[in-house]
């Protein structure tokens, strides 16, 4: 079975750039200056709280109506936050501490674990960087499988405790992701038994995942810098833990960019492209970006969750019929990563079969229209 790492190796990212020492920069370099930005102001958190229609839904997983609430959030937002999710606060603090410790290392030390162009694991810039003319005020560390080799380079004398945190975090996140997957499917009238690759225990034990540690250093000119440029995730879903520094924004039709405020103990869940496909477009993947702060450093940890890399994903049979044809063709995560590497945010459009027009479907449509996301 092809692994997620092999899928990334098949689509190398060639960006001839190494991170500067962000802390030493007193001015924003031209290569990081996004001068064309005209909507680059964080929405005031007080205004968000007053306007409930512009607040990302927060869902208590102990609520007996959690599945219904999640379905509504997925349909209308493509993103939601969860509380009472079962992940110990101490573990969330441990993984944040690991990220802060890693990104606080001297530049020469971090570069010992640099991700290779055809690799997925290690330290480096955002994989989406090649699609933009300017660089992002960002550094990341991706983990697929064991982090042992890279952590030995970073902490020769003390790597085991860092590895232990990653293993524990991965195990607990995989369980939570499976739970969220079941709730999202249930909201569509689909049971986990309806998913052939769910495994003998119907617990999605064969699912693939990657862990992404993100750092957004304080920036001398945040109004003209971009932490992470707008994109959707290729996943089924992405679970994000963030520190107390705002910056994550999601795009919602009619509202523009909406800030997702950090909640202590809360986790952000993004709908990804593969669930967009599985739901036949009912649950759109969310377009999101990250802005930076003048005086504070933002950290986040993303758990990128998807199917086994060679399993074909298509609109589920329960969601299609004579008046509801499939909008997307079958695609594996492995193949879709290649499509994403080539077409980026037009990847969904490239696997579309037909487009609804005034409530009807043009089955002869050949990817003529762009995908509306958010």
UniProtKB/Swiss-Prot annotation:
Needed cofactors, names only, are: L-ascorbate; Fe(2+)
Which catalysed reactions does the entry list for this protein? gibberellin A20 + 2-oxoglutarate + O2 = gibberellin A1 + succinate + CO2
Which intervals hold domain Fe2OG dioxygenase?
206-307
Give binding positions for 2-oxoglutarate: 298
**Keyword terms, alphabetized:** Dioxygenase, Iron, Metal-binding, Oxidoreductase
Expressed, tissue-wise, as follows:
Expressed in radicles, roots, internodes, cotyledons, leaves and shoots. Barely detected in developing seeds. Not detected in flowers or young fruits.
- How is loss of this gene reflected in the phenotype of the organism? Dwarf phenotype.
Per the record, the pathway is: Plant hormone biosynthesis; gibberellin biosynthesis
What residues make up the catalytic site?
298
Changing residue 229 to T does what? In le-1; strongly decreased catalytic activity producing a dwarf phenotype
Tell me how the cofactor is bound: Binds 1 Fe(2+) ion per subunit.
- Where along this sequence does the record place binding of Fe cation? 231, 233, 288
GO BP, sorted A to Z: gibberellin biosynthetic process
Top EC class of this enzyme: oxidoreductase
Q: State whether keyword Metal-binding applies.
A: yes
Q: Which InterPro entries match?
A: DIOX_N, IPNS-like_FE2OG_OXY, IPNS-like_sf, Iron_ascorbate_oxido_reductase, Oxoglu/Fe-dep_dioxygenase_dom
The Gene Ontology terms for molecular function here are:
gibberellin 3-beta-dioxygenase activity; metal ion binding
- Report the EC number(s), separated by commas if there are several: 1.14.11.15
Q: What else is known?
A: The Le gene controls the stem length trait studied by Gregor Mendel in 1866.
What does the record give as the function of this protein? Converts the inactive gibberellin (GA) precursors GA9 and GA20 in the bioactives gibberellins GA4 and GA1. Has a small activity on GA29, producing GA8. Unable to convert GA20 to GA5, GA5 to GA3 or GA12 to GA14. Involved in the production of bioactive GA for vegetative growth and development, but not for the 3-beta-hydroxylation of GA in developing seeds.
Instruction: Give the similarity note.
Output: Belongs to the iron/ascorbate-dependent oxidoreductase family. GA3OX subfamily.
Q: Indicate what this protein is called per its UniProt record.
A: Gibberellin 3-beta-dioxygenase 1
Which species does this protein come from?
A: Pisum sativum
- What is this organism's lineage? Eukaryota, Viridiplantae, Streptophyta, Embryophyta, Tracheophyta
Give the gene that encodes this protein. Answer: LE
């Amino acid at each position: 079975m092809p692994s997620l790492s092999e899928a990334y190796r098949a689509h190398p990212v060639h960006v001839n750039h190494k991170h500067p020492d962000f802390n030493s920069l007193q001015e924003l370099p031209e290569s990081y200056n996004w001068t064309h930005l005209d909507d680059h102001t964080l929405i005031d958190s007080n205004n968000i709280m007053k306007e409930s229609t512009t607040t990302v839904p927060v869902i208590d997983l102990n609520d007996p109506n959690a599945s219904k609430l999640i379905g509504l959030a997925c349909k209308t937002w493509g993103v939601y936050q969860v509380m009472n999710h079962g992940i110990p606060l101490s573990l969330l603090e441990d993984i944040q501490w690991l990220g802060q410790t890693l990104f606080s290392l001297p530049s020469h030390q971090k570069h010992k674990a640099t991700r290779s162009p055809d690799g997925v694991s290690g330290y480096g810039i955002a994989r989406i960087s090649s699609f933009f003319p300017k660089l992002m005020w960002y550094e990341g560390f991706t983990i697929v499988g064991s982090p042992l080799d890279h952590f030995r380079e970073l902490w020769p004398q003390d790597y085991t405790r860092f590895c232990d945190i990653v293993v524990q975090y991965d195990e607990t996140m995989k369980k939570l992701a499976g739970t969220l997957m079941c709730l999202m499917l249930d909201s569509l009238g689909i049971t986990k038994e309806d998913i052939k690759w769910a495994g003998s225990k119907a617990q999605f034990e064969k699912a693939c995942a990657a862990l992404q540690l993100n750092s957004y250093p304080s920036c001398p000119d945040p109004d003209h810098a971009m932490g992470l440029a707008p994109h959707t995730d290729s996943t089924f879903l992405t679970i994000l833990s963030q520190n107390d520094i705002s910056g994550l924004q999601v795009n919602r039709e009619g509202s523009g960019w909406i800030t997702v405020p950090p909640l202590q103990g809360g986790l952000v869940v993004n709908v990804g492209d593969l669930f967009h496909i599985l739901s036949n477009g009912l649950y759109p993947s969310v377009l999101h970006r990250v802005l930076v702060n003048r005086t504070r450093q933002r950290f986040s940890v993303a758990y990128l969750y998807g199917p086994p890399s060679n399993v074909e994903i298509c609109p589920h049979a329960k969601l299609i019929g004579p008046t509801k044809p499939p909008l997307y063709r079958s695609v594996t995560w492995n193949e879709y990563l290649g499509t994403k590497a080539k077409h980026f945010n037009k990847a969904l459009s490239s696997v579309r079969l037909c487009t609804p027009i005034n409530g009807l479907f043009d089955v002869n449509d050949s990817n003529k229209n762009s995908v509306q996301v958010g």
